[in-house]
Amino acid sequence: MKQLLFCIFLLLLEGCSSNQPPAVSGQIDELPTIYPDYIDVTIPQSIAPLNFAVQTEGKACAVFTTEGYAFTVYASNGAFSIPDTDWEKLLTAAKGKQVEVSVLTEEKGKWNAFLPFHIRVSEDPIDPYIAYRLIDPGYQLWNEMGIYQRELSSFDPVSYTHLRA
């Protein structure tokens, strides 16, 4: 009986959660100020999610749309953390096309929408890794340095060499 009640509770939670964008009350006639600035860039199809932040005091919402696929991400502090699986599906559907990103912010219980921006998704493949040297900004007197490789589809770094003076 407890298992049945638990299953019903989970179904109710699933039914109450929504991936739909909120109803828009007002329009802001400018592009959102986001960091990092991904407005009108071209990206490879296999890149990791491009998380970003928008300046807001309250809740924020980003709607990612392309032909055949769309999803919504909410942020309580303005920092969007895009789920890997949704991002991969989006880029697969948008290969050779563009993704429209609509950012909404909540003020006094009303949702306002900025002008949407676009991210183009290239059909061309890229190398899966990038190698780089990481040193402190004052490199003339370095005391620590490393050679790293980063996978571009997940941004996971691997250290090859870590040197100390």
Describe the role of every protein-language-model region.
Residues 140-149:
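Structural motif
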Residues 149-160:
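Surface-exposed loop/turn elements that mediate protein-protein interactions on large endomembrane-trafficking
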Residues 79-95:
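Signal that preferentially marks extracellular ectodomain short beta-strand elements
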Residues 37-56:
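Contiguous beta-strand segments within globular domains
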Residues 161-165:
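Conserved small/polar residues in nucleotide/adenosyl-binding loops
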Residues 14-15:
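C-terminal motif of bacterial Sec signal peptides marking the signal peptidase cleavage site
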Residues 95-107:
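Short, aromatic- and glycine-rich surface loops/edge beta-strands on solvent-exposed regions
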Residues 34, 113-139:
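Low-complexity, Pro/Ser/Thr- and charge-rich linker/hinge segments at domain boundaries
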